[in-house]
Swiss-Prot record:
<dbReference type="GO" id="GO:0042777">
    <property type="term" value="P:proton motive force-driven plasma membrane ATP synthesis"/>
</dbReference>
<keyword id="KW-0066">ATP synthesis</keyword>
<keyword id="KW-0406">Ion transport</keyword>
<comment type="similarity">
    <text>Belongs to the V-ATPase D subunit family.</text>
</comment>
<keyword id="KW-0375">Hydrogen ion transport</keyword>
<protein>
    <recommendedName>
        <fullName>V-type ATP synthase subunit D</fullName>
    </recommendedName>
</protein>
<comment type="function">
    <text>Produces ATP from ADP in the presence of a proton gradient across the membrane.</text>
</comment>
<dbReference type="GO" id="GO:0046961">
    <property type="term" value="F:proton-transporting ATPase activity, rotational mechanism"/>
</dbReference>
<dbReference type="GO" id="GO:0046933">
    <property type="term" value="F:proton-transporting ATP synthase activity, rotational mechanism"/>
</dbReference>
<keyword id="KW-0813">Transport</keyword>
<dbReference type="Pfam" id="PF01813">
    <property type="entry name" value="ATP-synt_D"/>
</dbReference>
<dbReference type="InterPro" id="IPR002699">
    <property type="entry name" value="V_ATPase_D"/>
</dbReference>
<dbReference type="GO" id="GO:0005524">
    <property type="term" value="F:ATP binding"/>
</dbReference>
Length: 209
C-alpha cells in the first residue's frame, strides 16, 4: 500500500482531501478528452485509409499511362517534354487546433497557366497527356492525404500522452491519496481514543484522591 509521506494531522488530512477532489476531477476531464481524441482519431484513420486507396489507384493509372507513353516515345523526347514545368506550385502551411493538437492544413498556391501540359503535342502521345492530366488533378488529394497522415500521427501521440496522464492519476496518485487519507484518519482516531482513555484514567485518579 503506497502512501504520501506527510504528518498525520488534521490540517494535512483536509489538504489531502482537497487534492483528492482535484485529482478525481482532473482524471474525469482527461478521460473525457482521451475518449474524444480516440473518436476523432478513428474518424481520421478511416478517411485516411479511403483517400490512400483512391490516390494509390489513380497513381497506378497514371503510371500505366506513362509507361505506355514511354513505349511509344524515345527517352530523349520524354525527358525534353518534362524538362520545363508549365506551372509553378507552392504550398501554404497553416495550423488547425483539434482538441489541443495543432494539425497542419496545406493550401495550394498555384500560378495560373493557360496550358496544363509542359510540352507541345507534335512528338508526344495521348498516354503522356493522360498521365500529366491525372497527376495534375491528383495534387489536391495528395496534399489532403499528407494532411491526414500527419494529423493521425500527431493525434496518436496526444492520445498516448493523455493515456499516460490518466493512468498516472488513476493508478498512482489517486490510490496514494486515498490510502494516505485512510491512514491519517485511522491515526487521528487512535490518538483521539488514547487521549480519551488517558483523560478517563486521570479523572478516576482525581476522584479516588
Amino acid at each position: 500500500m503506497t502512501m504520501i509521506h506527510v504528518n498525520p494531522t488534521r490540517m494535512e488530512l483536509t489538504s489531502l482531501k482537497k487534492r483528492l477532489v482535484t485529482a478525481k476531477r482532473g482524471h474525469k476531464l482527461l478521460k473525457d478528452k482521451q475518449d474524444e481524441l480516440v473518436k476523432k482519431f478513428l474518424d481520421m484513420v478511416k478517411q485516411n485509409r479511403a483517400l490512400r486507396e483512391e490516390v494509390e489507384a489513380e497513381l497506378i493509372g497514371a503510371f500505366k499511362s506513362f509507361t505506355m507513353a514511354r513505349s511509344q516515345m524515345s527517352a530523349n523526347v520524354v525527358e525534353e517534354s518534362l524538362m520545363i514545368p508549365s506551372a509553378k506550385v507552392s504550398i501554404n502551411v497553416k495550423k488547425e487546433n483539434i482538441m489541443s493538437v495543432n494539425v497542419p492544413k496545406l493550401e495550394i498556391l498555384q500560378e495560373e497557366s493557360k496550358n496544363l501540359y509542359p510540352y507541345g503535342f507534335a512528338n508526344t502521345s495521348a498516354e503522356m497527356d493522360a498521365a500529366i492530366r491525372t497527376l495534375a488533378t491528383m495534387l489536391p488529394k495528395m496534399l489532403k492525404l499528407a494532411e491526414l497522415e500527419k494529423a493521425c500521427q500527431l493525434m496518436a501521440d496526444e492520445i498516448e500522452k493523455t493515456r499516460r496522464r490518466v493512468n498516472a492519476l488513476e493508478y498512482v496518485l489517486i490510490p496514494q491519496l486515498e490510502n494516505t487519507i485512510k491512514y491519517i484518519t485511522m491515526k487521528l482516531d487512535e490518538n483521539e481514543r488514547s487521549s480519551r482513555t488517558r483523560l478517563m484514567k486521570i479523572k478516576e485518579m482525581v476522584m479516588k484522591g
